């Protein structure tokens, strides 16, 4: 859903879609062209500030980080039995991380509306792939 405004458009999408738009804008950040670059910078700022709380929520706990590093020893040694035992011993921390990631995924699936700068089709980079365009199409006119 797009409503034209003075600044740009109100774009309604899931937070996951906004994350993909943000990633695509960053992938194309070095593209030449002032109009496109301006839209990239402005839209990236708006989307990043909107997604920051989700990113913060996704950060693993210190306990999980330490376990993850220790688990790498079992993985590198290809010690499946040892890894399984290790995971069982620390199931509380692992379950907490799974719960945390479920909450993050739930947040990413929520719908939001952001005011973004429209990118005129004439200002799109020549080397933009179909996949990248598909991601950005909500902000292209």
What residue spans do the PLM features occupy?
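A composition-driven surface/loop motif
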Residues: 2-141
